Amino acid sequence: MKILVLNCGSSSIKYKLFDMTSGEVMAQGGIEKIGLPGAFLKLTDKDGKKVVIEREIPGHQEGIEFILSVLTDATYGCIKDYKEIDAVGHRVVHGGEEFASSVLINQDVINKVIECSDLAPLHNPANLKGVRAMEALIPGIPQVAVFDTAFHQTMPDYAYMYGLPYEMYKKYGVRRYGFHGTSHRYVSRRACEILGVPYEDQKIITAHVGNGGSITAIKNGKSVDTSMGLTPVEGLLMGTRCGDVDAGALSFIMDKEGMDGAGLSDLINKRSGVAGLSGISSDMREIEAAVAAGNPRAIMTLNVYNYRIKKYIGAYAAAMGGCDILVWTGGVGENQWATRRAVCENMEYMGMKIDVEKNEGMRGEEMVISTPDSKVTIIVVPTDEEFMIAADTLEILDKK
């Protein structure tokens, strides 16, 4: 069975085509700058080379039509006819409290995703554009929605409620939802497969750390807490997002700067985090280079960044009554060995010992990086959200 996975953003589409019989990735690529000058599709060809094709792409439907034409192209394609695609799996960012698992898309599901759109105004409408485009181009093709938030719907109320008037929750759904759920689910399961231990019996902390980042506590196979909240702003220090901050500080800044809600949103989403604190970049590689050169703000920023991750790991170990496995994933978690070392150092009190030699220089591969006598297994697992979406799509179709 061939399953196309789509991740539609406001001006982009990422895609992967899987042959689920073999688990092979048949094709992958993405479109950038939809509706803007200089739009292009980039793909990896059969020889592993990167190819860029420029073309005017006014909307998502034209973008997906372009993707289908490339998939069937004599030079770059891997299928003869797009009708060989059996189903489509879509990343949908926010399912609110409506969706605790992936679902086959119908009109009722679309309506509920629209209702959740005020919780993810930049993402859900774009995700639905992909759904509508596929229905227009291949009418009747089965489509499945896989939600970033669904995995975290097992959190207890004491973990997801904020200390605000209860009416804010009842009227507007103001609570912690969490994100990166598909990634946290994939890497936690994959870690247990690698280690040969039963998923349902473990206390796992997953650290998805990249330009965006979140930590999740998984007890007996269920998410019991996560660092992101109503929005992806809460929690860790991120590339341009502030992470945890005193809400009173925000009202103070608004008053001092004469700032409205839109200005505040821009501040905490786009002008804060690693970039705002360092004044250098949102890229941790550039921060590490500046640290090596002795830049004091870079040093402070890196310390804040690592400290925040360490603090959440400790908090979630306390919340679960211990930790059996710590999983690193995401762009930084998979590749920045110095961050992994800095966070895991001095955690021996909770049975966590990192193998400095194994960790150093290790990038982008599955590997245990804890010492043999570490009570907590520390493991790096590169995430594969697209495969998880394809697997969910296959499972739902098998149940039809």
UniProtKB/Swiss-Prot annotation:
PROSITE patterns, sorted: ACETATE_KINASE_1, ACETATE_KINASE_2
CDD domains (UniProt xref): ASKHA_NBD_AcK_PK
SUPFAM superfamilies in alphabetical order: Actin-like ATPase domain
A Pfam family per the record: Acetate_kinase
Regions crossing the membrane: none
The protein's required cofactors: Mg(2+); Mn(2+)
Xref: InterPro entries: Ac/propionate_kinase, Aliphatic_acid_kin_short-chain, Aliphatic_acid_kinase_CS, ATPase_NBD
List of residues binding ATP: K14, H208, V209, G210, N211, G212, D283, M284, R285, G331, V332, G333, E334, N335
Cofactor note: Mg(2+). Can also accept Mn(2+).
Binding of substrate, residues: R91
Entry protein name: Acetate kinase
Organism field: Parabacteroides distasonis (strain ATCC 8503 / DSM 20701 / CIP 104284 / JCM 5825 / NCTC 11152)
Name of the encoding gene: ackA
